Structures are given as C-alpha cells and as structure tokens.
C-alpha cells in the first residue's frame, strides 16, 4: 500500500491525484491496440474471457503488424490463486506487457499480475460496468468470492483504451451497473473531504479530483436515463458516450483521488450474503450509496434524487432488489460488522459508525426504498 505523505507529527500534507498515463476513448479503437502497445514491447499477454476473445480478436488481428500475442482465458475470480496461475504463464511466455480485456475482475487481475511481475499494463474495458479500469487498485476476493483485501498499487495503468463500438454492444444491465458504481463517487469523495481522510493514492483530495467527482454525478443525472434508453436499442448516442466516460474515467479518477467511504464498505459487507453474489458490483454499490446517505442523515431532496434515479434506470433501492427475499436480522448485522471492519473504508466517514448504527441505516434505506417504489 502506498504510504501517506506526512509531516513530522504524522499529519498528511500533500494533495495527490492519480490517473492513467493515457486514456483513449473512441469508436473502432480495438484495431489500434497493438500499435498503442508497441511502445512497451512486441510480446503481448492478453487476459480475457472466452467470449471476449471471440469479440475482439478479429479487430486486434486486423490491426496487428508484428506483435506476438499470447491469450489466456480468465477463470472468473480476482483471487490470489488466479493471479499466481497467470503470473506463471506470463513468466514462461516472456511477455513484455499485460493487457486485460473485459470487465472489472479481469482488469483487477491484470493490474495485480503486472504489479507482481513488474510489467506495464494496458486496460481495455469491453463493458462500462465499473470504475476499475483507471485505478491503481485491485480488489482481491477469496476463491469463493468473498471480499478479502484491497491491493493498493504504486501507479495507475499505463494506458486505458475504450472502444465504444464494443462497449455499446454489451448488455444494458452492465452499463446500468457502471452508473451504480459511479453514483457513489461524489458522495464518498464528499465524505472523505468532510472527515479529512486520505484518498487511495496516499494524499488528500485535490480540487481537480473533487470537481471530477461532482462532474461524474452531474453527468449521470443529465445523461443516465437517455443513455439507458439508447443502450437498450443498441444505439451509441452522445449520452451513451458521456456515460461511458463518466463510468470509466470520471468515476475512476474521482473515487481513487477523492477516496472511498461508506458505500463501498457496505458493498463489501454484502458479499457475506450468498444471495447477493449474482448481483453486479455497481448494483450493490448503488444500494450502499443510499445506505450511506441515510447514515449521514442527508437531506430528503438528495435522498429522493438518488432513489428516483436508481428506480428509473433499474438499480436496486431495497434489500429485495439485491436478491434478498427473506431479510434475516442476524445476516444484516453480519453485513454491518463486516462493513465496519478496521481495514475497510467505513472509517473514512465523517462520523463514528458502529455496526449497530449501520444495521439501522441498512434497514432504514430498505424501508425508504420500499416506501417510494411500492406506493
């Protein structure tokens, strides 16, 4: 984990913003991948899914001049078992650069492999479902899919490349999930600012990062519904392009350089309930955002704007929406205890949060969600 910049009394002094060396977004960019990667070397290791390879390989091959490509199929979980398996393949292949093509767990795994093998990494999202691509962070789970730890990396990816033609062809639920993840960015950055917490790159939030987090939220409010409607029809409008940038870049820089707080800690707590494992990351984070607002005693207008937005685009605002058909108090309390773990980000909230407080906020958020969506 990157050390915080501190003075002699242990107070964090520097404001730090982290970002990829280069961010590229446009239509048909997959054909240019090998030429972009050429600056790092000719031997490219590409981690993707079996279906992802079928979608991207023709375009990559069409644009490839003289690079040597080694593909490997991701096993589905960003865990140390998978990371170590891939490290062995990379070392045996003599690869120069790690390229992760796919979704959030492929990105996190690729970044971890690049870190442990000391190689550059290029992240290529084929979906806009999380803000993982731009961050210097990998979220590590157990083999069974339960949150284990954050792996804080010394730098952001060397390059992030988004081919919007490919992203627009993904199921719309993935774009919506990305909006759920991005929804938390501003509120968590605001909480960290209020509590004077450090961000994920070991410093304080810069003006630029806070404004990117605010722009992320504003972009969702202004474009989210239009983007969802267009994406359902497979149409890549300007609203869809804007949301892809918000989900990927604005949220990525905003969360990492603004900081994480309650919403993501709550997401991590919910991994303890098996029924939620079928939900996407951003869907759980969206409900975590609502819980965080209840925990903060946010204004009714703000809470209602979030509930209305989530309801309109299809993000969960109730426990039932997370797949929990039977709410068991002991399970919710376990979620609260896990979310309040000392090594998670609940400690960045501008108030002391005990598991009992969080339990009440979860149940309160569920009640609000049911009240406003079932009336």
Predicted stretch roles:
Residues 200-315:
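Active-site segments that bind and position negatively charged phosphate/pyrophosphate groups
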Residues 90-127:
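A short, small-residue-rich loop immediately preceding and capping a beta-strand
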């Amino acid at each position: 984990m990157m050390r915080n910049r501190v003075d002699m009394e242990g107070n964090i002094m520097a404001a730090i913003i982290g970002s990829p060396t280069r961010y590229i977004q446009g239509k048909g960019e997959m054909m240019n991948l090998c030429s972009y990667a050429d600056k790092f070397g000719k031997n490219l290791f590409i981690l993707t899914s079996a279906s992802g390879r079928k979608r991207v390989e023709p375009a990559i091959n069409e644009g490839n001049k003289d690079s040597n490509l080694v593909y490997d199929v991701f096993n589905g979980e960003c865990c140390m078992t998978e990371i170590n398996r891939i490290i062995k393949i990379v070392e045996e292949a003599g690869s120069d650069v790690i390229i992760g093509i796919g979704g959030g767990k492929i990105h996190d795994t690729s970044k971890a492999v690049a870190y442990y093998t000391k190689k550059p990494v290029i992240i290529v999202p084929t979906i806009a479902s999380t803000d993982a691509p731009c961050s210097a962070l990998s979220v590590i789970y157990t083999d069974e899919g339960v949150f284990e730890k954050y792996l804080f990396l010394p730098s952001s990816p060397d390059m992030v490349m988004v081919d919007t033609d490919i992203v627009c062809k993904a199921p719309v639920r993935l774009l919506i999930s990305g909006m759920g993840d991005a929804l938390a960015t501003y509120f968590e950055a605001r909480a960290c600012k209020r509590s004077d917490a450090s961000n994920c790159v070991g410093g304080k939030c810069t003006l630029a990062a806070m404004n990117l987090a605010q722009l992320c939220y504003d972009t969702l409010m202004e474009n989210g519904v239009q983007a969802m409607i267009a994406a359902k029809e497979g149409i890549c409008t300007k609203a869809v392009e804007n949301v892809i940038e918000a989900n990927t870049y604005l949220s990525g820089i905003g969360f990492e350089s603004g900081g994480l707080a309650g919403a993501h800690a709550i997401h991590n707590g919910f991994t303890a309930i098996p029924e939620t494992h079928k939900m996407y990351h951003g869907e759980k984070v969206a409900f975590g955002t609502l819980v965080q607002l209840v925990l903060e005693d946010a204004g009714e207008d703000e809470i209602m704007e979030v509930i209305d937005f989530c309801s309109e685009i299809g993000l969960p605002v109730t426990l039932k929406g997370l797949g929990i058909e039977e709410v068991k108090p002991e399970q919710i309390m376990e979620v609260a205890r896990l979310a309040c773990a000392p090594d998670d980000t609940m400690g960045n909230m501008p108030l002391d949060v005990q598991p009992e407080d969080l339990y009440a906020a979860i149940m309160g958020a569920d009640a609000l969600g049911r009240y406003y969506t079932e009336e």
